[in-house]
């Protein structure tokens, strides 16, 4: 009989209660969940006698850190998460339980990759694959792509994958195209649509066996695990890469404890091709090329004496969750009505768990030297740490080229480093993109997307609801807060607004002095006094007069005041709003998402405590005010997005591989923020690498409509450049 265990629940920090003397078990088990699953986790702890409580993390990668540092006890993980965990220094992780299917609860691996051929195929060496017709599940997939590429390369069958004139993906496609005479390899060969089509036009033989060779994408009769076997049996294929489960299903063989279901396909006409080129009967034990491990649960060695109890608790949770049809079963424990948690023979270390499936090299898929990573240039320690975490996470998820990180002191140092090939990319505000193009020979290649607004955002003026300002004209003499010098929402747009309304004369050069005079109460314009922004020493000191330096540092270094980095607390969107919210400023020039992101509990930073969005309003360009959510009718301008820029000196091949990696990361992590939160807070800091408000990324070219949106604003605010200073 199950004892009714006392329910313990905490919605915030979780502390394990003292273990009663003589008890072999934890009083409470702390399960780590990505923040998006926290509410479901709380329901789990409230609704069941599971002796579990919840620890929220940014994503699965942060869960690994929390388990390592004993802030959490366990979490569900994928093999890719295990790979990341195995690379963490001084870790003591253990995989103690697995998530298997009810159909195959006794199988050691989630699936086993096999090569199936016609039994009478004349092949005596693995090199005999040369010139054959090959059927694959799809590009980028484990069984039909990663595993054969990895293993055939190690065997010397597949050609070199390190041609510096080709991207990593094209190296693979080129090698497959020269190994096989024809194939069916559907899917997106590149995340950029134009590049995808160009590759398919270049290697058409890799689509020749597909149902629709001219499309070569899903859905296709000859794609997927079962489609690869149909391609072999019906469409002229000579070799198929699939998994054992679908071989059994295709040929009507028994699966797990189930009975055989005849399909009309004769298994005696086919055979497994082994890595040593021998053949084995389809009806016998398969020879596998590699296996994908099951998902599982990871803990640390502090749980060694509690593993049996924790295993039982997870199994109990599965029973309760299925009975109640609870959403937390999938969101918290990664289980569903087709899976079952199974005790393994371990616990195993993550490394040993992957190695027993021969899977580590499949994740790594090293193409060989020279390695050409995509190097992000960053300007703060917080951004550097996020970049390093992205590097590890993306590598485990097969995003190639790999990422790397370069730290510089500030924006212009980064721009020089990218120009001089010390780094490859940096993400910039639209106004900074203009500087990068004009002064550093850089160009945008990828743009952020913002949900329903696409690749634009609204620049807005925010005031306190209890203020008396009713128009831009009323702001004369006010204290102003800006995101940064030369940035779109914080500088270019308000300057353009004042000029277009003739509140500043178009002849009053330099405009920095004119704007300073208009906001005579003082301003914070981070970066205004940097030499590169103030070469003639014309920018007034008042542009930095209400800046604060680093309010969160134990010792506020005077050098930080008005710096164009997070060392200035009033820098960036959140910083400019903080300047307003703290009472230092009376208007903040930011983007339309800034106030919602920093009020009503959406930002956990101490300075946002108690801030309510209803206490702030938008100041409309043509007069009047509006609530924060009415930005579509009350804004100063629609402006282009933040963009990733690189050097104009990059070759087309280099541009393609940079785009490929960045777009692939954007695609994966916009769909699965639980794996890694690319768009969102990191360590309590906003807008690192990409803006919090971004929802995805897309390729952009010079001359596109995105770039054309700069023209009017830039033309107006640059009018002083060709005029002599009074």
Curated annotation (Swiss-Prot):
Disulfide bonds join 32-63, 41-54, 135-231, 184-210, 207-216, 274-287, 377-414, 387-405, 481-562. Pfam families: Transferrin (PF00405). Hydrogencarbonate 2 binds at residues 483, 487, 489-490. The keyword ATP-binding does not apply. Glycans are attached at residues 162, 337, 358. It comes from the Eukaryota. Gene3D superfamilies: Periplasmic binding protein-like II (3.40.190.10). Keywords: Disulfide bond, Glycoprotein, Ion transport, Iron, Iron transport, Metal-binding, Repeat, Secreted, Signal, Transport. Hydrogencarbonate 1 binds at residues 137, 141, 143-144. The keyword Magnesium does not apply. Transferrins are iron binding transport proteins which bind Fe(3+) ion in association with the binding of an anion, usually bicarbonate. This is Transferrin. It comes from Blaberus discoidalis (Tropical cockroach).
């Amino acid at each position: 009989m199950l004892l009714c265990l006392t329910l313990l629940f905490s919605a915030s920090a979780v502390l394990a209660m003292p273990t009663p003397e003589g008890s072999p078990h934890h009083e409470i088990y702390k399960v780590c969940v990505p923040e998006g699953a926290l509410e479901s986790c709380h329901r789990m702890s409230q609704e069941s006698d599971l002796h579990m409580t919840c620890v929220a993390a940014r994503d699965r990668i942060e869960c690994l850190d929390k388990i390592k540092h004993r802030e959490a006890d366990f979490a569900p993980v994928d093999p890719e998460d295990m790979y990341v965990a195995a690379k963490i220094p001084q870790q003591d992780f253990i995989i103690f339980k697995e998530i298997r299917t009810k159909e195959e609860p006794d199988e050691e691996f989630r699936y086993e990759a096999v090569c199936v051929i016609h039994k009478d195929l004349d092949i005596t060496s693995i090199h005999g694959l040369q010139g054959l017709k090959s059927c694959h599940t799809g590009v980028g997939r484990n069984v039909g792509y990663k595993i054969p590429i990895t293993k055939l390369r190690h065997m010397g069958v597949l050609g070199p994958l390190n041609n510096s004139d080709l991207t990593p993906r094209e190296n693979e496609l080129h090698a497959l195209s020269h190994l096989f005479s024809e194939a069916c390899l559907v899917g997106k060969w590149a995340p950029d649509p134009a590049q995808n089509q160009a590759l398919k036009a270049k290697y058409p033989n890799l689509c020749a066996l597909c149902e629709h060779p001219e499309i070569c994408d899903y859905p296709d009769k000859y794609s997927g695990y079962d489609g690869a076997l149909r391609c072999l049996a019906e469409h002229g294929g000579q070799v198929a890469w699939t998994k054992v489960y679908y071989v059994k299903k295709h040929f009507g063989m028994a699966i797990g404890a189930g009975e055989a279901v005849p399909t009309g396909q004769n298994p005696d006409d086919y055979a497994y091709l082994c890595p040593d080129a021998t053949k084995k009967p389809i009806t016998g034990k398969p020879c596998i090329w590699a296996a994908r491990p099951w998902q599982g649960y990871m803990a640390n060695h502090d749980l060694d004496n509690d593993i049996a109890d924790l295993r039982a608790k997870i199994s109990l949770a599965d029973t309760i969750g299925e009975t109640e049809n609870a959403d937390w079963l999938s969101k918290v424990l990664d289980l569903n009505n087709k899976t079952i948690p199974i005790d393994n023979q371990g616990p195993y270390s993550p490394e040993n768990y992957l190695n027993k499936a021969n899977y580590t090299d499949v994740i790594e898929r090293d193409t060989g030297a020279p390695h050409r990573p995509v190097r992000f240039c960053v300007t703060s320690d917080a951004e550097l740490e996020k970049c390093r975490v992205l590097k590890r996470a993306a590598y485990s998820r097969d995003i190639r080229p790999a990422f790397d990180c370069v730290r510089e002191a500030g924006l212009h140092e980064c721009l020089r480093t990218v120009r001089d090939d010390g780094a490859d990319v940096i993400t910039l505000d639209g106004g900074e993109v203009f500087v990068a193009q004009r002064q550093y020979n850089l160009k945008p290649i990828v743009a952020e997307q913002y949900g329903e607004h696409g690749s634009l955002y609204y620049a807005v003026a925010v005031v306190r609801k209890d203020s008396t300002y009713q128009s831009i004209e009323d702001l004369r003499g006010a204290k102003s807060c800006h995101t940064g010098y030369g940035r779109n929402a914080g500088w270019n747009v308000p300057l353009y607004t004042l000029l277009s309304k003739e509140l500043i004369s178009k002849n009053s050069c330099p405009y920095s002095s004119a704007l300073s005079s208009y906001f005579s109460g003082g301003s914070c314009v981070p970066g205004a006094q940097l030499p590169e922004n103030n070469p003639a020493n014309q920018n007034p000191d008042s542009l930095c007069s209400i800046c604060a330096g680093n309010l969160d540092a134990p010792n506020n270094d005077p050098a930080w005041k008005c710096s164009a980095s997070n060392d200035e607390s009033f820098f960036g969107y959140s910083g400019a709003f903080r300047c307003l919210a703290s009472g230092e400023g009376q208007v903040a020039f930011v983007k339309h998402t800034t106030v919602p992101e920093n009020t009503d509990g959406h930002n956990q930073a101490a300075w946002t405590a108690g801030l309510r969005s209803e206490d702030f309003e938008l100041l409309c360009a043509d007069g009047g005010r509006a609530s924060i959510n009415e930005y579509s009718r009350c804004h100063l301008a629609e402006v282009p997005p933040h963009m990733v820029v690189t050097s104009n000196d990059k070759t087309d091949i280099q541009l393609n591989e940079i785009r490929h990696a960045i777009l692939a990361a954007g695609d994966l992590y916009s769909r699965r923020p639980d794996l890694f939160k690319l768009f969102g807070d990191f360590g309590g800091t906003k807008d690192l690498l990409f803006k919090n408000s971004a929802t995805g990324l897309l390729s952009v070219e010079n001359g596109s409509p995105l770039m054309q949106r700069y023209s009017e604003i830039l033309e107006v605010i640059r009018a002083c450049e060709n005029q002599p200073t009074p």
